[in-house]
């Protein structure tokens, strides 16, 4: 055994002793308050438990492995529909309390006292449909997290799912603690570990984890204005060459450095045309009222959502397909104490109940969507009667685009329409009082200002970014100016009412 392995083992043993001591201290009272480390636990539990369960895929008749099961807040709920639940916790008194609460009611639960980091924990490969973990990885060190995720992927059947929920950045509960060994990590740590995890079966097939969704727990946003409760749902899939549109966004168009350089141009918190200036102008048209609910489709890094929530006291749900965008948005939310939650989601597959939102807002995003009529029908369904939709988006002039513009559209994967046709699609979806404005003149003024500021502040830009980054921005903005000045690329503003 080499020196590094010995040191890792020693640190691992110390970590486990510290964590076990911590939870033995907080498990003297086997109550929901002690498990959630919060005096308001009962109220929070009523709100968040159904929210968490609603994120899960169907577990009817399935095998569910619950890691860190505690006294069974979720165990009984899972057992109502699952074929078999394996409930595991490393504190003996806690798992016994779980069995006392749920064992007589549900005969499909196996209760286990075990440490998830122990090599003695044996779960058969490809035997589990869903692994469920609510506040667990934050009590493991980084190496333990990586090793456990590697084991979980092997335990899962192909097509199986992992749900994890963690406290990120800082403590949420108000319980007094003598010591607190919890690892309050940035969400991107967990995302990176899951994205980089691979496993192989006996036939040599390679499997990876594909993100289904990631979001703030809404109950904590509503009750505490706290965005640090983050959950992820991953699916075990066979590795393929085609990584899909989400990977394209995160690895090509919206890499982390790309997002930051866009923000440098658009202004802090913004990655769409005009930044704060156009956001304020457009949002002011919505006549927002305190307590209303807004859906932001393609929320980016959250600047517009923070503005709406802080200025008008509305609740905003921001969704974006880019993991990188949402990661930045959640990080920027910390400490703001506003009612904004974020979720990685595909607006073309996401479902909401009818009459959920007062406003649907989208800035320069729907250009990515190929089937706009279907999306607009969903917008109409999701809005309350009298609700409004506001969209700004890239458009094009009527007729056939030039070869150069057509190549640009294809390379970006855009679906562009002329302003009139765009407005007609909203009318066809059922909307009334449709305003479809050609805002290309404003677009040109904004582009010229943004390009001018970038060139004027070249030295400061190059202190934080590369020459290639600078050239990409200058060339990209110059090309947009050329296409728009020639009348090919347009920018539209659309407002409509249900």
Swiss-Prot record:
The keyword Transferase applies. Pathway: Phospholipid metabolism; phosphatidylcholine biosynthesis; phosphocholine from phosphoethanolamine: step 1/1. CDD domains: AdoMet_MTases. N-methylethanolamine phosphate binds at residues 253-254, 262, 394, 408, 412-414, 480. It comes from the Eukaryota. Keywords: Methyltransferase, Transferase. Inhibited by phosphatidic acid. It catalyses: phosphoethanolamine + S-adenosyl-L-methionine = N-methylethanolamine phosphate + S-adenosyl-L-homocysteine + H(+); N-methylethanolamine phosphate + S-adenosyl-L-methionine = N,N-dimethylethanolamine phosphate + S-adenosyl-L-homocysteine + H(+); N,N-dimethylethanolamine phosphate + S-adenosyl-L-methionine = phosphocholine + S-adenosyl-L-homocysteine + H(+). InterPro entries: Methyltranfer_dom (IPR025714), Methyltransf_25 (IPR041698), Phosphoethanolamine_N-MeTrfase (IPR025771), SAM-dependent_MTases_sf (IPR029063). GO terms for molecular function: N-methyltransferase activity; phosphoethanolamine N-methyltransferase activity. Induction: Induction by cold stress, salt stress and abscisic acid (ABA). S-adenosyl-L-homocysteine binds at residues 68, 73, 89, 115-116, 134, 271-272, 298, 320, 346-347, 363. Its EC number is 2.1.1.103. Phosphocholine binds at residues 167, 172-173, 177, 184, 262, 394, 408, 412, 414, 480. GO terms for biological process: methylation; phosphatidylcholine biosynthetic process. Involved in phosphocholine biosynthesis. Catalyzes the N-methylation of phosphoethanolamine, phosphomonomethylethanolamine and phosphodimethylethanolamine, the three methylation steps required to convert phosphoethanolamine to phosphocholine (PC). Belongs to the class I-like SAM-binding methyltransferase superfamily. PEAMT family. This is Phosphoethanolamine N-methyltransferase 1. It comes from Triticum aestivum. The lineage of its organism: Eukaryota, Viridiplantae, Streptophyta, Embryophyta, Tracheophyta.
């Amino acid at each position: 055994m080499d020196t590094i392995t010995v040191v890792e083992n020693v640190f691992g043993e110390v970590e486990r002793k510290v964590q076990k001591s911590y939870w033995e201290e907080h498990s003297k009272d086997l109550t929901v308050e002690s498990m959630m480390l919060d005096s308001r636990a009962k109220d929070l539990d009523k709100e968040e438990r159904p929210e968490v369960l609603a994120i899960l895929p169907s577990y009817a008749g399935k095998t569910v492995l619950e890691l860190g099961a505690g006294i069974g807040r979720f165990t009984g709920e899972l057992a109502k529909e699952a074929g078999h639940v394996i409930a595991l916790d490393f504190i003996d008194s806690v798992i016994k309390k779980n069995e006392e609460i749920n064992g007589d009611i549900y005969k499909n639960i196996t209760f286990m006292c075990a440490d998830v980091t122990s090599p003695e924990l044996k779960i058969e490969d490809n035997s589990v449909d869903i692994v469920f973990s609510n506040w667990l990885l934050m009590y493991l060190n980084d190496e333990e997290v990586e090793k456990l995720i590697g084991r979980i992927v092997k335990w899962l059947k192909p097509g199986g799912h992992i749900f994890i929920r963690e406290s990120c950045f800082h403590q949420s509960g108000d319980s007094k603690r003598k010591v607190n060994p919890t690892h309050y990590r940035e969400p991107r740590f967990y995302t990176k570990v899951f994205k980089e995890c691979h496993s192989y079966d006996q036939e040599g097939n390679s499997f990876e984890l594909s993100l289904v969704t990631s979001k703030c727990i809404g109950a904590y946003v509503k009750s505490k204005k706290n965005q640090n409760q983050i959950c992820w749902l991953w699916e075990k899939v066979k590795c393929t060459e085609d990584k899909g549109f989400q990977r394209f966004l995160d690895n090509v168009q919206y890499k982390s450095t790309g997002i930051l350089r866009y923000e440098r141009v658009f202004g802090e918190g913004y990655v769409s045309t005009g930044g704060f200036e156009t956001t304020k102008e457009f949002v002011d048209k919505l006549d927002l009222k305190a307590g209303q609910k807004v859906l932001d489709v393609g929320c980016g890094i959250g600047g517009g959502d923070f503005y709406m929530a802080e200025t008008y006291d509305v609740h905003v749900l921001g969704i974006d397909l880019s993991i990188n965008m949402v990661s930045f948005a959640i990080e920027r939310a910390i400490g703001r104490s506003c009612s904004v939650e974020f979720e990685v989601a595909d607006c073309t597959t996401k479902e909401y109940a009818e009459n959920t939102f007062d406003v649907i807002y989208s800035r320069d995003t729907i250009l990515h969507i190929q089937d706009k009529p279907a999306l607009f029908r969903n917008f109409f369904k999701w809005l309350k009667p009298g609700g409004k939709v506001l969209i700004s988006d890239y458009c094009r002039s009527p007729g056939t685009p030039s070869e150069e513009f057509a190549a640009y559209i294809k390379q970006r994967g855009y679906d562009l329409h002329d302003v009139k046709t765009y407005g007609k699609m909203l009318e066809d979806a059922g909307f009334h009082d449709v305003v479809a404005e050609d805002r290309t003149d404003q677009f040109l003024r904004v582009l010229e200002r943004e390009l001018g500021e970038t060139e004027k502040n070249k030295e400061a830009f190059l202190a934080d970014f590369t020459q290639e980054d600078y050239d990409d921005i200058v060339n990209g903005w110059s090309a947009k100016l050329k296409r728009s000045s020639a009348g090919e690329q347009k920018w539209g503003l659309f407002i409509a009412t249900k």
